[in-house]
């Protein structure tokens, strides 16, 4: 379904944000988007998962969409 496709896309976005944070914690894209689009604890969990130190972070579609609205209003 469309909702499942959206959830998978948001999950990939969480993974990419976590990877950016692992490479460079002060990356401008990471700082601007990660905290607005996802609960930061979930980003940290995903970072730990990528390093093999913990469970996978959970992407929240509603939180992601709320963050997108906030970002759209800022621009």
Task: Tell where the protein language model's regions lie, with residue ranges.
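Flexible loop/N-cap segments at domain edges
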Residues: 1-14, 22-26
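Charge-biased C-terminal accessory regions appended to nucleic-acid-, cytoskeletal NTPase
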Residues: 18-75
């Amino acid at each position: 379904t469309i909702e499942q496709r959206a959830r998978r896309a948001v999950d990939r976005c969480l993974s990419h944000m976590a990877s950016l944070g692992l490479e460079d914690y002060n990356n401008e894209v990471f700082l601007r988007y990660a905290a607005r689009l996802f609960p930061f604890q979930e980003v940290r969990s995903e970072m730990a998962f990528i390093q093999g130190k913990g469970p996978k972070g959970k992407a929240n579609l509603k939180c992601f969409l709320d963050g997108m609205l906030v970002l759209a209003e800022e621009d």
